[in-house]
Amino acid sequence: MRLNLLKPALLGAAVGLAALPALAQTKVTNQGITATEIVLGTHQDLSGPIKVWGVPVLNGMQLGVDEVNAKGGIHGRKIKLIAEDSQYDPKKAVLASQKMVEKDKVFAMVGPMGSPTVLASQDVLFDAGVPQLFPLTAAEFTFKFDPKKPQERLKFSNLLPYVESTRAGVKYMVEWKKPKAVCIMYQDDEYGKNVFDGFTQQLNAMKMKAASVTTYKRGASDFSAQAAKMKSDSCDMVLMGTVIRETIGLMAEAKKIGFAPIWLGATPVNVLEIPALGKELVEGLYAIAGFIIPYRDTSTGAVKAWCEAYFKKFGIEPNSQAVIGYNVVMTFAHYAELAGKDLTGQKLLTALESGKEYKDIFGSPPTKFSATNHLATTITQVQQVKNGRWVLVKGDLLF
């Protein structure tokens, strides 16, 4: 893997494209494929506000690359992964994408990080015919595509989507806990708006209305006003469209003023850092989730071996972000292998849309795509922090 810092000056080399059959009229690149390697790109937040996501995701991706390459690669081709630091800045994500497409000649962009950053940069990829595979955002724009816009066929998502997972989680919690005043605080960007959409859609379906709606700007650190408003509005269940520090920050402010609703986090809340940093403050917190978080001291079999390999390589405990990053690479490798020895962009798309399943080692729902569905799964879980660890409350949820 080569990690580069962003540079404003980007080369303007043309990208070689191969036109697909009239079936979709999608342009897809064949660049980045040689007899010995496949060049992949990613942009992560490695030094910005969500680096606690970006760094372990990239670690997991590198572990996957190492594993694939140690086994001889994909039909003899080793993966070369190029990573750029977007710092969770949409403008830097655009520059990173341009650089990787035009200079590094990436075959695909895999696991790019963040709703605002992915949204800002994805057209750079589509215009060049570069597939955007398994981004680290579960926003709807990462998998919903208009058949009349053939370049949108280049996007695939294997994350549990924010809208559908939020609906499933809210439905379960409302039916179980029967709160009287359901409320939400969400980040004012594409991620948060997707969570809000799922929240409102589910309440509408249940003939309910939100008792309080509050937002915050990305990067905010003071949540006293939001906590006070929700307490004033008598909220007894709060959905948080937050990430890590915002989750802990809001719950800390709530504790100061004696506000103790049922707390439910969207999927980005379901990470090890929440109980590690929040400690007793976050005991009892619920979160919507896609898979069981592996703990190195209690895992068994292939998951135990993976945890130990991660710890040996990076010297830190593995987490859910690392699992997702690892799965990005392994899912790509699975479908690139299916595409055959003479790999092309067209053959990769055909393999992805074949309906054939990929099953990871972590017991996640199977990944499967088709020509009309580029979303892997909508099966949801709810987990809770108990004694400092995430434990499963309910699985196999749909709305």
Feature map (PLM): residue ranges:
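Short, low-complexity disordered leader/linker segments with a strong preference
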Residues: 1-39, 397-399
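Beta-alpha junction/loop-to-helix N-cap segments that form part of ligand/metal-binding clefts
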Residues: 26-28, 37-39, 52-59, 67-144, ...
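Extracytoplasmic "Venus flytrap"
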Residues: 28-62, 84-91, 113-114, 185-194, ...
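Hydrophobic alpha-helical segments within soluble ligand-binding/sensing domains
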Residues: 93, 157-181, 222-224, 247, ...
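Extracytoplasmic ligand/sensor domains, especially the bilobed periplasmic-binding protein
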Residues: 105-212, 262-287
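Hydrophobic alpha-helical
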Residues: 115-126, 228, 236-257, 328
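Extracellular/periplasmic periplasmic-binding protein-like sensory domains
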Residues: 152, 251-326, 338, 396-399
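Segments of small-molecule ligand-sensing domains
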Residues: 310-322, 333-392
